[in-house]
């Protein structure tokens, strides 16, 4: 058969449709997100979480090692000293300010490896998109883990008869009976008078503050 007069590009469309027809019968990999959400892996690198001890005190000691380890400069930490009147962690210091900028964060997990107290871990939450850059800066209050049974919100006193090492040995499993939350003077809170005469959100009088 003489092929001299045949156009060499004649078979190109046929070859192209051949690829299309073969793909029509393959298993589809498209996921109907967000209508159908796929379960993430157990060790998925999602939004960060600041963890608590079993009694509710914070694990973060404000060492800033996570900020130094971050290759994207996305973490900002300010440490402060604990006092007996206002204690946030069992140790000497705590993280007074903790921010993560998710406009910069690459979710690499290097900050998790650098944390000496396991205060920082990563959750399975990945829906972090927002229309505002300011909303992508998560504060300590947004990152701090919620309270579970047996916990009292910080600040409060450490478990009587224990020290910081006992917390890391796992000897403290819940808040001591009668533990109450302390007044957060560093956050501008003031002592409140009784609810019988003042509301829970009304400022205390100068007479009460001077006591």
UniProtKB/Swiss-Prot annotation:
Binds 2 [4Fe-4S] clusters per subunit. Its EC number is 7.1.1.-. Residues 50-80, 96-125 form the 4Fe-4S ferredoxin-type domain. Keywords: 4Fe-4S, Cell membrane, Iron, Iron-sulfur, Membrane, Metal-binding, NAD, Quinone, Repeat, Translocase, Ubiquinone. GO terms for cellular component: plasma membrane. It is found in: Cell membrane. It catalyses: a quinone + NADH + 5 H(+)(in) = a quinol + NAD(+) + 4 H(+)(out). Its cofactor is [4Fe-4S] cluster. Residues 192-211 are annotated as: Disordered. Pfam families: Fer4_7. [4Fe-4S] cluster 2 binds at residues 70, 105, 108, 111. GO terms for molecular function: 4 iron, 4 sulfur cluster binding; iron ion binding; NADH:ubiquinone reductase (non-electrogenic) activity; quinone binding. It is a peripheral membrane protein. [4Fe-4S] cluster 1 binds at residues 60, 63, 66, 115. NCBIfam families: NuoI, PRK05888.1-3. NDH-1 shuttles electrons from NADH, via FMN and iron-sulfur (Fe-S) centers, to quinones in the respiratory chain. The immediate electron acceptor for the enzyme in this species is believed to be ubiquinone. Couples the redox reaction to proton translocation (for every two electrons transferred, four hydrogen ions are translocated across the cytoplasmic membrane), and thus conserves the redox energy in a proton gradient. Belongs to the complex I 23 kDa subunit family. PANTHER family: NADH DEHYDROGENASE [UBIQUINONE] IRON-SULFUR PROTEIN 8, MITOCHONDRIAL (PTHR10849:SF20), NADH DEHYDROGENASE UBIQUINONE IRON-SULFUR PROTEIN 8, MITOCHONDRIAL (PTHR10849). NDH-1 is composed of 14 different subunits. Subunits NuoA, H, J, K, L, M, N constitute the membrane sector of the complex. This is NADH-quinone oxidoreductase subunit I 1. It comes from Streptomyces coelicolor (strain ATCC BAA-471 / A3(2) / M145).
